[in-house]
Amino acid sequence: MEIMEKAKILEAAGRDIIYLCLGEPDFPTPAAVVAATHRALDAGATSYTPSLGLRELRQEIVHHYRKRYGVHLEPEQILVGSGTSPLLLLLFAMLLETGDEILLPDPGYACYPDFVRFAGGVPTRIKTTAQNGFQPRPAEVEKLINSRCRGLLINSPSNPAGSVLSGQELRTLAQLPIPIISDEIYHGLTYEGEEHSILEYTGSAFVLGGFSKAYAMTGWRLGYLISPLTCARTLQTLHQNFMICANHFVQLGGLAALRHAEADVERMRRLYDLRRRQLLK
């Protein structure tokens, strides 16, 4: 964000800037989402909602995972929040005591280590290479597991490498004796092969998902955390104490995205892929 702010100053001074610092779509939010949010505001959807999020939205997320991945969830497993970042922070607050470790891919999203440290934990980096797709391999992860290790964070499709873990790779990682935290915010933007969720292979993982990337809704700040039922109430309690709930009308926009914007997502995905292919020529 600091780099972007400096770039904005240079742009205002007349410099021609190409932004490579943020994973932000350059498409507008789908019209159906904007229209639904206008209607929600006109109807007075400006109150608190349940801290887990609107049940209708959570049920639609359940439907989305069943349709896309064949995964069966309960609405109570889903915590809707104002973006995935605060939800990840709450998750680390639940998992970590001072000095506990979280295993992180390196390279990886620059904010991951800060979230771990803020919760009192120690970020332990797993060095990855181009040969393994810049993704952690089970053998390397196992070497780093110790009595203070509280989880492995994976990101597929990944930031910054863009690499994707295969179904078999996810299946193997799911067998590790530590919780898997899967950041799936870039799901919907895969260009080759099949897209899989860690939830296809284990019911004990934590999954971060949202609307920012695939639906071009970065500024709306809407995401969700899927957790095992045994952890859902604790996460809900943390959320209602620190954040209360996500914005009511924004949640209704997210509902419209899931119900009416899949064609927009596919159109944007095809255009991203076209740009990618042009860049690689």
Model-predicted regions and their roles:
Residues 1-83, 90, 257-260, 277-278:
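N-terminal small-domain helix-loop-helix segment of the aminotransferase-like
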Residues 72-78, 98-101, 148, 203-204:
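Short acidic capping loops at alpha-helix termini that bridge into adjacent secondary structure
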Residues 94-116:
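Conserved PLP-anchoring active-site segment centered on the Schiff-base-forming lysine
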Residues 100, 121, 176-179, 203:
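A short helix->loop->beta-strand "cap" motif at the edges of active sites that frequently abuts
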Residues 118-124:
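A short helix-loop-beta submotif of the ANL/AMP-binding
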Residues 124, 128-193:
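Active-site phosphate-binding strand-loop segment of PLP-dependent enzymes
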Residues 201-273, 277:
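Conserved core segment of the aminotransferase class I/II
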